[in-house]
Amino acid sequence: LTFNKFTGSRGKSGSNDANAEYLAQLRRVMDEADVAYQFAELGKVDLGGGGTIAYIMANYGMEVIDSGVAVLNMHAPYEISSKADVYEAVKGYKAFLLYA
C-alpha cells in the first residue's frame, strides 16, 4: 500500500499536505494490522495534470492522504501491479476503516 502525503501542482495551488499527527495515527494502524506500506511522491508536481479529490475534502476540514496500489508505468500501454500489493491494500483499507 502506498501513501502520498502531499499532492498538488504549481507550488501549493489546489494541494493538500497530511500533518504529522495524522501520519502517526495512520502508521500505528498499519503497523498494528501488519500491513506492508510505503510513502511515495507523485513526481514533478509543477508539470500539473492528474490529481485527486483529496484537496477538496481537505477544504472541509477533513484529515486526508492519498493511498493506493503501487503501479509501474501508469497510463502506459502496459501497467504492472503485484497481487501482493493489492492484497496489502485490502488489508490496509480494512484496518483503516476498523481502527482509524
Spans of features found by a protein language model:
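His/Asp/Glu-rich mid-to-C-terminal helical/loop segments that flank catalytic regions of hydrolases
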Residues: 69-100
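Active-site-adjacent substrate-binding region
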Residues: 1-78
